[in-house]
Amino acid sequence: MKSHIQSLLEQTIESFKQQGILPADFEARIQVDRTKDKSHGDLATNLAMMLTKAAGKNPRELAQLIIDNLPASAYVAKVEIAGPGFINFFIDDSALANQLQAAISDEHLGIKLPTPQTIVVDYSSPNLAKEMHVGHLRSTIIGDSVVRTLEFLGHKVIRQNHVGDWGTQFGMLLAYMEELRAQNGEQAQLELSDLETFYRAAKLRFDESAEFATRARQLVVELQSGDEYCNKLWREFNDISLSHCHEVYERLGVSLTRADVHGESAYNADLEQVVKDLDAQGLLTQSNGAKVVFQEEFRNKEGEALPVIIQKADGGYLYATTDLAAMRYRSSVLKADRVLYFVDLRQALHFQQVFSLAKLAKFVRNDMSLEHLGFGTMNGEDGRPFKTRTGGVVKLVDLLDEANTRALELVRSKNPDMDEATLAEIARVVGISAVKYADLSKNRTSDYIFSFEQMLSFEGNTAPYLLYAYTRVAGIFKRATDIDLSQAKIVLEHEKEKDLGNKLAQFGEILSRVIDKGQPHVLCGYLYELAGAFSSFYEACPVLAADNDEQKHSRLLLSQLTANTLQKGLNLLGIETLERM
């Protein structure tokens, strides 16, 4: 509906250009917003005030002129001018009902799909050396939610799990694995549960033994030169690490697969060429033996230009080099229209610099959008980064285990007679959903406090509340199995029916915001409001006990569309729904 009003206003502006009211080359960004006070209509725009200077007319006079020139629309019941020149639109109830009716049988719930694009999404991307920890959660689940929404809206999405599978630390790991093999024979296997212990032991050996450190550095050189033995050990280690990652992804309900892994090592062969191409364009400068690029727009507090280090004095490459190679690949090979990076906000300057450099060096097409969608930190209840009681990093699997245990206790307390298998399955869904939703419901750019007590509450904007809200709506149809709705029509008469209908009609607008800004919390807020709108409707408007069949069938259709929207919205967040709780 919002996009429809915007389209009417766009046509009006074109008419003004033809009439000479506005200059022929005039361009305006039309903003249409939902009103908070329904006495002011359903939608409003300040377009008249925006056009005042260009048209040379006062806002109220211009507002009336806009209304007089609006194309006729069955969706608009009336239009009014308010205040200094706001234009308020009242949506026709029957037109809204028809829109909702069509949405019920549509796989996209009546949403008009945008022009499809090819969109690369870089997310999760853990370093392969240690087990995934809580610091990997946000990128993984925020990125996955946006990916799901992009695909639902018809875009071609290419997932890129840019894992850290290369670098000098692998010499240390390979050297330690080599020692273990020497002690235990070729049959020695590194178990997934040993990843943290293995890494810490290797680091300890590296710090304490000069001989070990020398061997580690030697192995880096051999690995980079393609030594078969080193590459074999390296592949084994990465395979173990990736197996662990994908076990976590499966538990989280994340859609990443092995086929989506395109890590740092994938660009090894391109790094030398990146350096040569930057040098050929005269962009490289020598600084303390390193090859760097200075860009005038990036300076420190003292006003000195900040370097992007491309190659270290010892010949080694850095993240910037790999990122530039990845950007070129995503532009020239993957043909991306947009590339979205879900990476910690603390990397903001890095991405600003490499995005600018990639454009400057023509590594990417000018029309390709590079977007760093950064996120804040998950903190403990003390307001500091989430840690174990001993100050260590919290493993993601341990966090999920704890969530499952607490969810099981919660579900059992509410269903003491339920069988263990059903309890376990419900607890699995509730526990994982609670962790994911607690994160996704927060503004991506904000830090937030992690609290099991809050996230497992059945009150407020939480996963348990929404999962229960869905089962409540779906439960209506368990009591209405013999009712034929094939000829039923939605009729909006009661104020609460209209409120619910208006909220349902906003789903497409919400999903557009999710994919435009990478903000799943907007969808979470919408689903919470939708559940509240349904609750108000259900209390005020008897469904199965309606006054007549026409009213009952209409309200059942509204309930069905609510269930469909809640389920689809939760699925786009990567959250399973339950039929009972």
Curated annotation (Swiss-Prot):
GO terms for cellular component: cytoplasm. It comes from the Bacteria. Belongs to the class-I aminoacyl-tRNA synthetase family. Its EC number is 6.1.1.19. Keywords: Aminoacyl-tRNA synthetase, ATP-binding, Cytoplasm, Ligase, Nucleotide-binding, Protein biosynthesis. A motif ('HIGH' region) lies at residues 126-136. Pfam families: Arg_tRNA_synt_N (PF03485), DALR_1 (PF05746), tRNA-synt_1d (PF00750). It catalyses: tRNA(Arg) + L-arginine + ATP = L-arginyl-tRNA(Arg) + AMP + diphosphate. Its main location: cytoplasm. NCBIfam families: argS. It is an enzyme of class 6 (ligase). This is Arginine--tRNA ligase. Monomer. GO terms for biological process: arginyl-tRNA aminoacylation. The lineage of its organism: Bacteria, Pseudomonadati, Pseudomonadota, Gammaproteobacteria, Alteromonadales. Coiled coil: none annotated. GO terms for molecular function: arginine-tRNA ligase activity; ATP binding.
